[in-house]
Amino acid sequence: MSRLEAAVNGKKNLFIPFITAGDPNPEVTIELALTLEEAGADILELGIPYSDPLADGPVIQAASKRALKHEMTLEKALSLVPKMRAQGLTIPVIVFTYVNPLLQYGEEQFVKRAADYQVDGILVPDMPFEEGEVLQAACQEHNLSLISLVAPTSNKRIEKIAARAQGFVYCVSSLGVTGLRDELDPRVHEFLQTVKTHASVPVVVGFGISRREQVEALAENADGVVVGSAIVKLVGELEDELNDPEKLEDGLFKIKRFVSELISS
């Protein structure tokens, strides 16, 4: 059983935070990962910063800009994972990358590199499901999970994607880019139920989740939540503290407290 399979096996209320590699700087990204595991994260989603992030709203776009100031590349982002492991990170790491940098690097080469660096899965939001055969084969060869992203589209397409999902199915709570939302789309529950009827792996939901009430409401039909913009926004607000070695501990504590309050039942 892989590290990811072990993490999700029979577990409810999975918490999957998203952070951007290199934000606010590479060293603090490692500290953030460790802090998030301490706060209760089951899986870490690590975003590769990119200059043209189609699925990301302004909060995560700003995080990419902060990371790119440190010349964070796909290779450098991947290399953070073994450093996290060396400092005690035990949870699975899913790498979130867009298709252009992936193709420039080479799909098979990227997967091999990710496996060498102890990554557990890959998520490519702008790669159509039908075009993922090369990536799927490479992931299978190197024992990585290719995470399926499912949007509220036709039932036939949902069934096709959910049935072939690995690790977990990542459901998009609403169409559009990532970002904080005051209210979730009321149709999300029906959508999650549809996905669950076809999936043999846990069903998690992301995009727009930022409050404990939303986490609690989604627990009825989802096996877990992905929280990105709310955490990344806080990282941006605490940028000065996190970049100051004397204030770093206080900044990390504030993030841990926010996450603990978000997922406490």
UniProtKB/Swiss-Prot annotation:
EC number per UniProt: 4.2.1.20
Catalysis performed (reactions): (1S,2R)-1-C-(indol-3-yl)glycerol 3-phosphate + L-serine = D-glyceraldehyde 3-phosphate + L-tryptophan + H2O
Cellular component annotations (GO), alphabetically ordered: cytosol
Pathway membership, UniProt: Amino-acid biosynthesis; L-tryptophan biosynthesis; L-tryptophan from chorismate: step 5/5
InterPro entries, A to Z: Aldolase_TIM, RibuloseP-bd_barrel, Trp_synthase_alpha_AS, Trp_synthase_suA
Highest taxon listed in the record's lineage: Bacteria
Assembly description: Tetramer of two alpha and two beta chains.
Function, as annotated: The alpha subunit is responsible for the aldol cleavage of indoleglycerol phosphate to indole and glyceraldehyde 3-phosphate.
PANTHER family: TRYPTOPHAN SYNTHASE ALPHA CHAIN, CHLOROPLASTIC, TRYPTOPHAN SYNTHASE, ALPHA CHAIN
This protein's name: Tryptophan synthase alpha chain
Organism: Halalkalibacterium halodurans (strain ATCC BAA-125 / DSM 18197 / FERM 7344 / JCM 9153 / C-125) (Bacillus halodurans)
Gene: trpA
